[in-house]
Structures are given as C-alpha cells and as structure tokens.
C-alpha cells in the first residue's frame, strides 16, 4: 500500500507536497551513484524539473563553454568522459524581481591530478549537493508560484584524472579576467 501523508488540521496540503517533493528530489540527486549522476544525468534531472514547471532551459556544453567565455567550468570538467556543461533555467514573469540561485554541480571530485586519498574520495558523489539543494529550492519556488523571475544556474562537471586535466600550479583565467592559481 502506498504511503499516505497525514497532515495536521488546517495544514496546506499543496505546500506540504511541494516541500516533500523538493526534499525528495534533493536527497535522490545527492544519493544517486556517480556512474548514474554525472553531468549528463544531472542535466536530465534538471530538464525534468524545468519540464514540470514549463521553465526554459539553456545548456552550454563542452568546448562551447570556451566559445561563450566559461573557461573555469570547462577547465574543471575537460578531462572527464562526459562533457562539462552549464545548465540554466529561467522561469517566471519578466516584470517580476529577478532571483538567481547557483548550485555547485561537481558530480564526482577525484581531485583531478591532485588525487584525493581513497577515504576522502568515497563520498565525492555528494560534491554536487549544492546543485541538488539549488534544484530543490527552485522546485519549491516554482511550485509555490512565487512572484519572481527565477534564474537557476548549475555548472555540471566531473573533476577527473586524465591527460586534459589541469595541473597543480596552472594559472587559469576566469570569465571576469581574474587569474586563479590551481592548488590542492
């Protein structure tokens, strides 16, 4: 028999359902094994969320990140088997105040060439918890129909070991022109 939610008298069932769905989404994203929740899996979940609320999605993937001036996202994910990507969701009326939410979507963080010790790598599938929480929050905002223009941004990458990985000591230039030296 399916579970049944019992609410106190006077509770808003729609609000409770929105919270439960958001918490479940967040929990399921974080707990999904990395072989099923890489950048592509996160993009699929992102698209499903957008579809539920008739939101617009834009994805910048692979070398297009460089062409559109997202070099840091590209650098972190370029050594992985799945292309890095920037996921963007837009929802709400143009006349409403803009609310932007950004969630870190490092689907697995091996440490790249600064390889993490095994005991620290075990739970690195959860390094995309920021993205999962941002998506859960966006779900609640859209379910509530809040009078905002929502902009959700999730850089989805895997920080992998490979010939294309950035090295300790490399200096990368960000979208704003700020240089960043890679360290452990």
Residue ranges and their predicted role:
Residues 1-107, 143:
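N-terminal hydrophobic/helix-forming segments and targeting peptides
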Residues 68-72, 111-119, 161-168:
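Short acidic, glycine/serine/threonine-rich loops at helix termini
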Residues 36-40, 131, 163:
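Short alpha-helix boundary/capping motifs
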């Amino acid at each position: 028999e399916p579970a049944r939610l019992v609410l106190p008298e006077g509770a808003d069932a729609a609000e409770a359902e929105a919270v439960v769905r958001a918490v479940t989404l967040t929990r399921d994203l974080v707990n999904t094994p990395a072989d099923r929740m890489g950048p592509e899996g996160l993009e699929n979940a992102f698209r499903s969320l957008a579809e539920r609320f008739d939101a617009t999605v834009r994805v910048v993937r692979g070398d297009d990140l460089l062409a559109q001036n997202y070099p840091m996202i590209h650098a972190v994910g370029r050594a992985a088997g799945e292309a890095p990507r920037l996921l963007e969701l837009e929802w709400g009326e143009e006349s409403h105040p803009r609310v932007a939410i950004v969630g870190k979507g490092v689907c697995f963080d091996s440490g790249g060439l600064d390889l993490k010790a095994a005991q620290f790598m075990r739970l690195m599938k959860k390094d995309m918890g920021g993205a999962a929480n941002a998506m859960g929050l966006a779900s609640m905002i859209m379910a509530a129909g809040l009078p905002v223009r929502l902009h959700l941004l999730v850089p989805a990458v895997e920080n992998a070991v490979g010939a294309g990985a950035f090295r300790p000591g490399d200096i990368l230039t960000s979208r704003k022109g700020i240089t960043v030296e890679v360290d452990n």
